[in-house]
C-alpha cells in the first residue's frame, strides 16, 4: 500500500482527543481495501473484520449490522464507530428473492438488480436503526449515512449512455444532529469531513480539511478528480475547489502532516 505509513489528521483522531473510543467494523478481511493500515492511520483504536466473528465469507448486511449492534451495546460511551457495508458496492447480481421491483418496465437488468440491492440495504438499515432505538442508543447518537462512490448513474434511468458528474450522486444523511436542513445545492465528498467535524463539536481541531461545513458555508459546486465540475462555477469557493485534488495529492505523496500536532486550538 502506498503512503499507508503517513500521518493523517482524521475524525477518528479528533474524537479520540475528546475521549471517544473509536472502532471500525468491516464486512471483509482486514487486508481488503487496506483496512489494516488505514484504520489506525485514521484514528481507529479497534478494527473488527469478518474473522472477528468467525466468518470465512464476506458478511451480509444483516449479519454485519447484527454483529455491530452487539459490539456497540457493550462499548463504553462515548464512542465513534464506522460500519462498512458492501451489498451495494457492485449490486449487479440478480437477487435470490426478487421483489416487485424486478417487474419494473425496463430492458436494463443492471438497473433492476441495483434497485433490488438498495431495497435490501434500506430494509437492513431500517432494522438496524430500529434496534438502536430499542436499546436506547439511537437517542444518544449522531448517525451519518455516507456513500464512498456512486454505482449506477442517473443516466441509465434516462436511457443515456454517457454518464456526467451530475449523474453521480451519492448519499449523505445525518440523523439526530442539532441542525435541521435539507441541502439542495451542489456539494462534494470533500465537504463531508468538515461537516462531520462541525456537527461533532470539533471545529477547533487542527485540520479541518479542504472542503467546507455545509452547516456554515454556502457550497454551490463540486469538482471531480478528472477536472469535471458541477454547480455554480462563479462561486467564490470554486477556484479553491479546482485546486483541491492537486493539493491533496501533494499532501499525501509528501507526507505533509508528518511531525505536526493536531490538538485543539485552545490547547
Predicted segments with their positions:
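Solvent-exposed soluble domains appended to multi-pass membrane proteins
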Residues: 1-267
Amino acid at each position: 500500500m502506498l503512503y499507508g505509513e503517513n500521518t493523517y489528521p482524521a475524525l477518528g483522531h479528533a474524537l479520540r482527543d475528546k475521549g471517544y473510543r473509536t472502532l471500525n467494523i468491516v464486512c471483509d478481511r482486514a487486508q481488503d481495501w487496506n483496512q489494516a493500515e488505514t484504520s489506525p492511520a485514521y484514528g481507529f483504536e479497534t478494527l473488527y473484520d469478518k474473522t472477528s466473528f468467525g466468518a470465512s465469507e464476506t458478511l451480509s448486511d444483516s449479519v454485519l449490522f447484527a454483529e455491530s449492534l452487539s459490539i456497540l451495546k457493550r462499548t463504553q460511551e462515548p464512542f465513534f464507530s464506522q460500519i462498512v457495508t458492501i451489498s451495494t458496492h457492485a449490486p449487479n447480481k440478480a437477487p435470490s428473492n426478487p421483489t416487485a421491483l424486478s417487474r419494473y418496465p425496463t430492458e436494463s437488468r443492471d438497473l433492476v438488480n441495483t434497485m433490488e440491492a438498495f431495497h435490501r440495504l434500506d430494509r437492513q438499515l431500517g432494522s438496524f436503526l430500529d434496534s438502536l432505538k430499542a436499546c436506547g442508543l439511537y437517542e444518544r447518537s449522531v448517525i451519518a449515512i455516507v456513500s464512498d462512490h456512486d454505482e449506477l448513474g442517473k443516466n441509465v434511468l434516462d436511457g443515456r449512455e454517457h454518464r456526467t458528474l451530475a449523474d453521480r450522486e451519492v448519499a449523505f444523511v445525518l440523523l439526530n444532529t442539532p441542525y435541521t436542513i435539507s441541502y439542495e445545492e451542489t456539494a462534494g465528498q470533500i465537504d463531508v469531513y468538515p461537516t462531520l467535524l462541525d456537527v461533532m463539536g470539533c471545529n477547533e481541531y487542527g485540520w479541518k480539511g479542504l472542503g467546507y461545513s455545509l452547516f456554515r458555508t454556502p457550497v454551490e459546486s463540486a469538482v471531480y478528480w478528472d477536472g469535471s465540475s458541477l454547480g455554480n462555477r462563479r462561486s467564490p469557493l470554486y477556484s479553491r475547489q479546482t485546486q483541491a485534488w492537486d493539493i491533496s495529492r501533494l499532501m499525501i505523496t509528501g507526507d505533509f502532516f508528518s511531525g505536526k500536532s493536531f490538538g485543539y486550538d485552545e490547547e
